[in-house]
A protein has these predicted regions:
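Domain-scale signature associated with acetyltransferase and cell-envelope carbohydrate enzymes
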Residues: 1-124
């Protein structure tokens, strides 16, 4: 999410719920109950956040990520850090986009685009 302050956040979600949401498959049933609080990039992810991997140019970031889990294709699953909980799916980019929408489904609305007491005159 490029600017989270514009969207209402939901969650946390169990990893199994996120996997089911994108028709993915967990690499281990033992990972089903892991709680995920948010989404992030490989490089910026923290514990309890989920990320994704779909581009081989980011192999180094995948190896170094601190994410709690990763959405990844079965073909690339061996590149993930050993023991990392994975959601396996055909299109990790699309899967992560769907997970992003689950965490941030609603745009925040505001009643005012400017301050209520602003007074704009000819001289501004």
């Amino acid at each position: 999410m490029s600017e989270k302050s514009f969207f209402e956040k939901t969650g946390p979600y169990k990893l199994k719920i996120l996997s089911d949401h994108i028709n993915g498959k967990l690499n281990s049933i033992e990972n089903s109950d892991i709680l995920i609080d948010d989404i992030s990039s490989l490089k910026n992810a923290k514990d309890r956040e989920i990320t994704f991997f779909s581009n081989l140019a980011y192999k180094k970031d995948l190896k170094e990520t601190l994410a709690a889990a990763c959405v990844i294709s079965e073909v690339n699953a061996d590149l993930a850090p050993k023991g990392m909980p994975l959601i396996l799916c055909d299109d990790p980019y699309m899967g992560f986009a769907l997970i992003s929408q689950k965490f941030y489904p609603k745009e925040l609305k505001t009643d005012h685009l400017t301050g209520q007491k602003n007074n704009i005159t000819n001289n501004i």
